[in-house]
Amino acid sequence: MSEKTGTRFHNSIQTNGTLISKKWIRLFKSMKYDVGVSYDGLNNDLHRGKSTDTIRGFELCKKLKYPVGTISVITRENLNLRAQYEELKKYTKHMKFTPCFRTNSSNFAVEIEEYISQLKLLFEHWLLDSNTTVLHPIVYYIREVLGILETKECVHAACLGRMLDIDASGTIRICSHVADDAFILGQWGEYANISDIFNGEKFNSVVSMMIEKRINCKNSCRFFSFCQGGCCSETFLSQSGNVDFSCEVIRDFMPYVETRLREILSTSETLEAYNPKFIELVQEAVCKNPLRLKWLGNL
């Protein structure tokens, strides 16, 4: 925390893990860094490579009792989510699967129907697993249904005006997901202060686009409070004929999670057969939002 302003800082780093060493781990511990490793599991060599070095980094972190998380990009080649989950839980207790949605430059995008089908299979598999891994987006959706979701990812949190992407060359983008000129706001050296960045024509055109999108979503979708109209990059890409991937997933998967949780909480006298992390989430909901939980089950 800054003693001068009272501002809290949280440090994290995303890496492929290939150069993790004892020296780096000591530094991460001393600086209280959260470390995420980009690793695509069984198919890592297809798009990232150096899997042996990444696994060596995992094993070293495990030996020195330094927990790391993983982020895996889901493409057509690694769409067997249950197999990916089983592979990754050897190395981490906190994993996240991020589907590769269609962009102007991506040839690896998964089909929505296939991804949703795999996500449901993974959900059922995780529910009955004894492993305590925090699995996103599964846990993220469960927390929303239970009424205990407190923080949101940028794609569901109306991020415009709160975040910027600045690459190594100093190029400023509204979002790193889109390389289109409409999202490029110029170079860092062109601005006297950050507020000037948010007052430009390009930025405000994207804001106008999202205001219109959110008005439509709020009037037509019951999940608006969860997604806040979705991701600005996906909304922009959808104007070129691409499907709004996250929107379609939420509309299909969220009702599925609601139905399954209602079944579990209404019929199970005990939750002992379920994932310990799931039980922990239900217990948290009992404390924080018992009325929501009563709606889901006969409590």
Question: Language model features by range: what are they?
Answer:
Residues Y115-G147, H177-R222, Q228:
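C-terminal accessory region of radical SAM enzymes
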Residues S169-T171, K213-L299:
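Radical SAM enzyme core and accessory elements
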Residues M1-F108:
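Radical SAM/AdoMet-radical enzyme domain recognition
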Residues L81-E86, K90-K152:
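Long, K/E/R/D-enriched contiguous segments that form extended
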Residues I172-S176:
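Beta-strand scaffold of nucleotide-dependent catalytic cores
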Residues I13, L122, G170:
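Conserved, mostly hydrophobic/aromatic
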Residues H156-L160:
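Short, small/polar residue-rich loop motifs at catalytic or cofactor-binding pockets
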